[in-house]
């Protein structure tokens, strides 16, 4: 929701550089900063007298321990996260664990030691982008659309929204970076009015990498399957050069500069410059640093071939998400009409060559500015949300959720409510019930992943990712109707609601805590494991379903024969037969927890063969034989017995 008055802006909050745009005079204006540059370094420096934003990058070598960069790599992460620990080895910054294991950046400011969370640092960058926009527009700005990598999890998205709040902004929407690039591409091509197109966005920036396949048709932008690495980009390519030259300096001069902040930062700046030079037409460049450490100068040369060799595994790593994106989208590479390059790191010739080779020599689309495309799309989205960009109101962006979301039901089964690649925002609900007679409450545990068993998936949010619904009135198992709702908003943030429809008891949770969701590595690992163990998962799932079907049928029969509202009376002999058979089945289940699927199914058929004819005769007395299985019978709740075809809702049980 936009605030009253003023324009809304779009901000690309990047790992290394940020950019801001606004919709004005029927077009997007990418706004230059006070130095005349259309992108601003995402750097923040603290001195004895002031704070420097953006321009801080120019004095980083003189003040390395107090110049903060790469803050985006800390957003929404915990201190002990592997990527945080890995990055800390390369930073001249001091990072310590804060409350709740939140990484805190330590700097000296005005003679005092201060600690800042990544959200605070990023908010300072946002404030700078806000000031740039306000200086250009001549009035205050309250509303903004802010971009994030496609695979940012719930806690990272919420942390980004918090960053906006700290900066005094109303964050109208958190939007995925490749989707913004897609909007920029779509508007660039709109004048030619192309038919339906499959467009692959290849977004390789300073710290993150996103791939998305989108279909454009008549102003509708539908995301098919996003893939991402939230820890891969130009900074990592720089690190390879830095490590190479640290080793070279040690070999030639017997001096180790790995822990020397000033020397390391000067070397890193030179390496970034060399990378940019090698990405242009130059095949070789030199690095010259006077008095790098203890009066020793450093001079070396680096060729493009050597640079490519040092980073080849990372370059090839960029192709894996492309392949997975196409596979999940069920689209062949030959069906991709355009491959759009976004992000400064796509200027690297070897990256372009590998991508072109992957698509069998297809010409890559370079018509949009890779540094500005994301901010461009964000500005368009901001205009639409604020009601300003009426000319673009026919543009509809359909995003998706990257992994399946569900909860744990009886037997540790992952019951999926929202499958992966579902278009968001979305809202799905399902009826569940109790597992035991007179059960006073249920535990709702939210999971994310593709495995059949919840123990193989990731519990979302740990302590905040589960909640209890208590106060359920005493009733036989399977009778209470518990409505569970999963609601994902347009920002990709999940809310879970649960309500006992009989008693009116309610509870809810928003999965936004600092424990976070899945990192890219965890996602890739889970998907690989899911592929590897798919057959095993299916077998386990079948066993649990067969066991639950037998158990549900047995308890439903027990409840049915005890129900005094049953029309007609059971013959005493028939009632005893059912009681005996049910007790034997339950006892057999308790003794055979590891029974195979066929054994469980045979036992169920045996029990059905005895009970069904008796129950059918009971209902035939009134001429209203129930349709479907015993899950539809009186007293049985909605057990969801195998083979049931009743029209009632399918209800699964929650421990």
Curated annotation (Swiss-Prot):
Q: Could you tell me which cysteines form disulfide bridges?
A: none
Family label:
Belongs to the heat shock protein 70 family.
Quick one: where's region Disordered?
A: 622-655
Annotated keywords = ATP-binding, Nucleotide-binding, Stress response
> Domain of life here?
Eukaryota
PROSITE patterns noted in UniProt: HSP70_1, HSP70_2, HSP70_3
The organism that produces this protein has a lineage beginning with: Eukaryota, Viridiplantae, Streptophyta, Embryophyta, Tracheophyta
Give the matching InterPro entries: ATPase_NBD, Heat_shock_70_CS, HSP70_C_sf, HSP70_peptide-bd_sf, Hsp_70_fam
Any GO molecular function: ATP-dependent protein folding chaperone
Q: Where is the composition biased (Gly residues)?
A: 626-646
* The UniProt record lists the keyword Ion transport: no
Record organism: Daucus carota
Among the Pfam families in the record, one is HSP70
Protein name per UniProt = Heat shock 70 kDa protein
